[in-house]
Amino acid sequence: AGQDGFMRF
């Protein structure tokens, strides 16, 4: 989560 800026919550 948040490794590629996709799951940036």
Swiss-Prot record:
It comes from the Eukaryota. GO terms for cellular component: extracellular region. Keywords: Amidation, Neuropeptide, Secreted. GO terms for biological process: neuropeptide signaling pathway. It is found in: Secreted. The keyword Secreted applies. The modification Phenylalanine amide is found at residue 9. Its main location: secreted. Belongs to the FARP (FMRFamide related peptide) family. This is CalliFMRFamide-13. It comes from Calliphora vomitoria (Blue bottle fly). The lineage of its organism: Eukaryota, Metazoa, Ecdysozoa, Arthropoda, Hexapoda.
